[in-house]
Amino acid sequence: MRLEILNSGYRPGTKLLFALIQLFSRQPVPDAAKLVFYRPDFYGSRAKQFTHEAMRGPSAWSVADRELMAAYVSTVNESAFCVAAHSATARQAYQNGPKVAAVLADLETAPVGDGLRATLRMLGRLTKEGKVDADDMRQVLSAGVTRQQVADALAVSAAFNTTGRLADAFGFAVLSPEGFEAGAKYLLKRGYR
């Protein structure tokens, strides 16, 4: 269900910002950006802060790894907007489109390390079933992933399980490939602020 709030209801300064974004990028403002600017005191500011910390804060996971986690969680959730956005960002971050495509097509045969594979497998189960157990954690830890890396991956999962559900509930418009590539470039340069 597409909500009209994504098209209107913004303060004059925000409307000006959106106009400038469209002017300089020659792309429509993504609905994800529109959502965080609508009632920033209620959702937007907190969501941006949490997501930025999960995706760009200190971590043993690279930015590319975390973007791939976001794309993988979004794939499990079947969130078209988020899959496209974070696949584009992971492709640019890794500078390796085939690697990203391989992970999203078949995690078990994809060219990634055991630790990342085990972590993605755990995030996929958590996303699909809403729970993981001690065996899941043992598998991740035995693949060489630290407890802090698990916590960091869970933060990515939390951010994009939330965002993906909002994207689908609000009917986020799927951008053109050029729009997603421009968004990915922005996210890699500026993060989620």
Where are these regions (language model features)?
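Hydrophobic alpha-helical segments
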Residues: 1-193
